[in-house]
Regions:
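Histidine-centered, transition-metal-coordinating active-site segments
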Residues: 1-69, 74-79, 88, 108, ...
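Alpha-helix boundary/capping segments in eukaryotic regulatory proteins
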Residues: 82-85, 100
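Helix N-cap / loop-to-helix initiation motif
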Residues: 85-86, 105
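Conserved short loop/turn motifs at secondary-structure junctions
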Residues: 95-96, 113
Length: 398
């Protein structure tokens, strides 16, 4: 397949650079170098034992944050290649998008956010930025990974602008304001928070949706939270299943699940490519900055696919995320986060020595953020082990 570069692609030779200037690293482009730094980071490795929906001990074949991120990167590269975008930047953003997630999935995040409300709250996007700009401490010349402007911009804005043209917070941040980590970093390295991100960042974001829905369908079926028959009335998944059963009558259930998920992913990818090409032809952006200035997303589903996607998400919410088997475990997982946070905040000597060094301060908000950083970086397994060591019980099984 012959490669081409879209007029609106991000060009590595035109990168706005890094906060701390560095010599180039041939033959890698700046974006390829970003991807490599993300892959070699401690935070990326820890994703192996962080939950998507199931706590890590539930089964070896269910997705974790790591397997999910790899799958998002595969989808994202496929779309980027078809659209003529920079594949390295797209992949870097896909691999980094979940770095800031807590143990125990969204349940852990909700509990940590609740506990941190008096101190500025918790936001996984802001935490991802903290990790790559501050918390990873591997290099002699700087904290963080010193990623390029384009990667940081995409990491922060992959779901759209954070503020309006007057600087007022938008969307999820309208009521609570922007997280301090984003405000502080943007003041040093302007991320243009009022504009959309690059097409590559938008591809990474929609690839997350594609992988999430398709693979949670797979995991939910394997876990027995719903069965193949339940998919029959769900647009997209039901259509894919009908095609599979018609093509291979008598196919066994496991193969039917795999073939159905394959078709869901393929159909969504094809739709994004076709719809984005249609928008690009109509809007005619001629550069990456032109994409940022469009005032609307360039990358997206068609109206029909967007509706099917919403229906599938609603189905998964009812059948899977709200299933008693899942919610019961998540409620107990939230207790782990709560117990650990309260214990560390009350007695900083419980923290490891390398996390204690900066903790002796009269600034309780700063100390709470230190505790938050420590807990947010935990894997499910480490959080459970710490809880058992400190409280001599395993709350997931009581």
């Amino acid at each position: 397949m012959q490669r081409f570069t879209a007029l609106y692609a991000s060009l590595p030779e035109q990168s706005r650079g890094r906060l701390v200037p560095e010599a180039e690293s041939p033959p890698r482009t700046p974006f390829a170098r970003d991807r490599d730094r993300i892959i070699h980071s401690s935070a990326f490795r820890r994703l192996k034992h962080k939950t998507q929906v199931f706590v890590y001990h539930e089964g070896d074949h269910y997705r974790t944050r790591l397997t999910h991120s790899i799958e998002v990167a595969q989808v994202a590269r496929s779309i980027a290649r078809a659209l003529g975008l920079d594949e390295d930047l797209t992949e870097a953003l896909a691999l980094a998008h979940d770095l800031g997630h807590t143990p125990f999935g969204h349940a852990g995040e909700r509990e940590l956010d609740r506990l941190m409300r008096p101190y500025g709250g918790f936001d996984h996007n802001a935490q991802s930025l903290r990790i790559v700009t501050r918390l990873e401490r591997r290099y002699a010349a700087f904290d963080g990974l010193n990623l390029s402007w384009e990667t940081l911009e995409g990491l922060v804005k992959h779901n759209g602008p954070l503020v309006d043209d007057e600087g007022n917070p938008r969307g999820l941040y309208r009521e609570r304001g922007l997280p301090e980590a984003i405000v502080e970093y943007a003041a040093m390295h302007d991320l243009q928070l009022a504009s959309y991100a690059s097409a590559e960042a938008q591809v990474a974001a929609i690839s997350d949706d594609i992988a999430y829905n398709a693979h949670d369908t797979d995991d939910g079926l394997r876990a027995g939270l719903f069965d193949v028959i339940d998919l029959g009335d769900v647009p997209l998944a039901g259509e894919a299943l009908a095609t599979v059963l018609k093509t291979w009558p008598g196919i066994d259930t496991q193969r039917a699940i795999h073939e159905t998920v394959r078709r869901v992913i393929s159909d969504m990818i094809a739709d994004v490519i076709a719809e984005t090409r249609r928008r690009a032809e109509a809007l005619a952006p001629t550069s990456a900055d032109a994409v940022r200035a469009l005032g609307r997303p360039l990358v997206g589903f068609s109206a029909q696919m967007a509706e099917k996607n919403r229906t599938l998400q609603s189905f998964l919410s009812g059948k899977m995320y709200k299933h008693p088997q899942v919610t019961g475990i998540m409620e107990r997982a939230q207790r782990v986060v709560r117990d650990l946070f309260e214990a560390y905040l009350a007695d900083q000597s419980l923290l490891p020595a390398n996390w204690r060094e900066e903790s002796f301060t009269d600034d309780r908000s700063r100390f709470a953020r230190q505790v938050c950083d420590f807990i947010a970086g935990m894997t499910d397994r480490f959080a459970l082990d710490q809880h058992k060591r400190m409280f001599d019980l395993d709350p997931l099984f009581r």
